[in-house]
Amino acid sequence: MQTPLIDLRAIRKSYGGGDSPLVNVLRGIDLSIHAGEFVAIVGASGSGKSTLMNILGCLDRPTSGEYLFAGENVAELGSDELAWLRREAFGFVFQGYHLIPSGSAQENVEMPAIYAGTPAAERHARAAALLDRLGLGSRTGNRPHQLSGGQQQRVSIARALMNGGHIILADEPTGALDSHSGAEVMALLDELASQGHVVILITHDREVAARAKRVIEISDGLVVSDTACDLSAPRSANPAALQAVDLRKRLSEGSGSRGAWKGELLDAVQAAWRVMWINRFRTALTLLGIVIGVASVVVMLAVGEGSKRQVMAQMSSFGSNIIYLNGKAPNPRAPKGIITLDEVAALGELPEVKMIMPVNGGQAGVRYGNVDHSSYVGGNDTHFPAIFNWPVVEGSYFSEADEQSAAAVAVIGYKVRQKLFGEHTDPIGQYILIENVPFQVVGVLEEKGATSGDLDSDNRIAIPYSAASIRLFGSQDPEYITIATRDANNVKHAEEAIRNLLQRLHNGKQDYELTNNAAMIQAEARTQNTLSLMLGSIAAISLLVGGIGVMNIMLMTVRERTREIGIRMATGARQSDILRQFLTEAVMLSVVGGLAGVVLALGMGAALLLSKVAVAFTVPAVAGAFACALVTGVIFGFMPARKAARLDPVAALTSE
C-alpha cells in the first residue's frame, strides 16, 4: 500500500496552562492524505480547522502526537528543514491574501523562489508566466492596494505555485471575496487538483467544501466525519511531487538553500529602500544621528590631522638634525651648569658637528614710534639662517663684521614686522628700541608660523651675539647652544659624541641637558595623535547616539512588519533569512547615513579651509568613520533582527 503523503496520528494541540487556563484546540486527530487528493476540511469557527492547517503546513507544532510527512517524522526536523518543506512542498493561500504591501504582484510571487535560490532570470520568467496564466499578465507591477480582492487572491495562488506547490493549503480562500471572484478562485483550485496537486481546502462553507473529492468534518478538535464524495481513484500525483524515498535526501541537500543569499540580499536591499522611501521623514530623522556622528568623527580627525601636519611641517622646517644644549642643575641644591664659549669652540671641533651657534637671549620689550611689543630677542651668530633653513625675505642678515664690532643691528621676524610696521612701512633702515637700546633693522625673516601652543617662531628678533652680550644682557655666557649635526639620520650618534666630550669637560658632572629636534618632533606628533584620538572619541559619542536611533527604528520596523515576517516564513524563509533581511536593512540605514555623513564632512572641511583652518582629510580616517557606521548598523541592528528571526510564524501571521 502506498505510503500516505500526510499521516497524522493522535495529534493534540493545547494553549495556555500555568497561570492561564488550559485550552485544548485539537483533541486527537487521526488523518491520512495521499498524493493527488483534493480534500476539504470543514467546520464551524473555533472547531480547530485553522490550527490543523498550521500544523499541516509546518507553521506550528503539535503538543503531542505524531505527524509523518512522506514517511518522515516532522517532529525530528529542524527549523531549516521545516522552512524547506514550507518552501518546496507547501503553497499557502490565505483568506486575507497575506501579500507584502510594499511589493509588486511579481515581487510577491517571486518570494518563495528567492529563498529557494532560483536564479533571477528564471524566477522572473516563471512568476510572469504564472501571473499571465491566472489572468494577471498586465498587473505584474501593481501593488496589492491597486488590485481587487479576487486579483490579490490569484496573486496568492501564483505565489503558492512558484516553487511547484505540491500541496496547496487554502484557508478560507473565498471568505473575503464576492461570489464571482470566489467562483473563479474555486475553479483555479479545481484545475490545480486536476493537474495532480494535493489541495487541502479549509472552509466553514459546505457548498465550497462540496467541490472537493473528500470532505473531513471537524468539531471541537475532533474528526467527526470523513466522507469521500468521489469514489474514483485519486488523480495521478504531480510528477514532481515529493516521495517518501527521497525526502530525507532532499531535505539534507536543500535546507541550506545554497545560492539563495544573493537573491535574498538583493531582495533585502530593495525592501529596505522601499521602506526607507515610504517612511521618508522618519528615515531622515533616524539618519540624522548617523550623519552627524560620521561627519563629526571625520571633521574632528581631519582638524586634528591638519593641525598635526601644520605643526610638524613648521617644526621640521627648522631641521631634524638640530640638537639643543642647555645648562641645568645636577640636583635641586646645586647651581645651574654653565656652557662657556670655550666649550662651544671645543664642541665645534667634533667631526659629527656641522655647525654650532651660541644663543644669548630672552624676552624683551620692543618699541617703534608709539607702538610697543614684547618679543624674544636672541643673540646669534651668522650661522642662524643656515642652521634653521630660515632665509631673509627683506634686506639681509647681519655680517661677520657686525658680529665682530657688536653692531646694533637687528633682523626681525615676520610677526614683529607686522606689529611694529604694518603692511605699508618699509622696516629696512628703521630704528627700533630694544629695552630702550636703539637697533637698526637690516632684514626681515621669512614667515615660519607657530610651532606648538603659544610659541610663535615669527615673534623673535635676531641680533649679533656680541651686541646681545654687551648692549642688552651683560653676560658673555650663552643661554643655550644650537648644534647642527652632519648626518640627519644619525643624530643619536652625534648626541652621544657631544655627551662624551661634555662629560670630560665637566669632570663627569651632569650639569647640562641635550635635546634634539627629531625627538621633539616625535613627542609633538604623539601629543597631536593623542589630541586627535580624544577629538575623535568625543565625536564618536554622537555616532553611538545614532546607532541607538537605528536600533529604535528597527525595533519599530519589526513591530510594524510582524505580519510580513510571518508571510516570509510561510513562504519558506529560514530564521537566518529573516535575520539577514532585517540586518541588511539596518546596515542600509547606516550605509546611507555614512555616505551622507562623509559628504557633509567634506563640505564642512571645505568651509573650514576657506576660514584658514588647517584641515587634512585622510583615506583611513574617512574609511574608518564609514566602517564605524557600518559596524554600528550591524551591532545596533542585530537585536531587532534577532527578535524578528525568533518570531513564531503563526503569531506573526495573525498579528494586526
From Swiss-Prot:
Subcellular location: Cell inner membrane
GO cellular component: plasma membrane
EC number(s) on file: 7.6.2.-
Annotated CDD domains: ABC_MJ0796_LolCDE_FtsE
Keyword hit for DNA damage: no
Record GO terms (molecular function): ATP binding; ATP hydrolysis activity; transmembrane transporter activity
Domain of life where this protein originates: Bacteria
Keywords: ATP-binding, Cell inner membrane, Cell membrane, Membrane, Nucleotide-binding, Translocase, Transmembrane, Transmembrane helix, Transport
Pfam families for this protein: ABC_tran (PF00005), FtsX (PF02687), MacB_PCD (PF12704)
Binding site for ATP: 43-50
Main location: membrane
Function, in words: Part of the tripartite efflux system PvdRT-OpmQ required for the secretion into the extracellular milieu of the siderophore pyoverdine (PVD), which is involved in iron acquisition. This subunit binds PVD and drives its secretion by hydrolyzing ATP. The system is responsible for export of newly synthesized PVD after the final steps of biosynthesis have taken place in the periplasm.
UniProt similarity note: Belongs to the ABC transporter superfamily. Macrolide exporter (TC 3.A.1.122) family.
UniProt subunit comment: Part of the tripartite efflux system PvdRT-OpmQ, which is composed of an inner membrane component with both ATPase and permease domains, PvdT, a periplasmic membrane fusion protein, PvdR, and an outer membrane component, OpmQ.
Name under which the protein is recorded: Pyoverdine export ATP-binding/permease protein PvdT
Native species: Pseudomonas savastanoi pv. phaseolicola (strain 1448A / Race 6)
Lineage: Bacteria, Pseudomonadati, Pseudomonadota, Gammaproteobacteria, Pseudomonadales
Gene label: pvdT
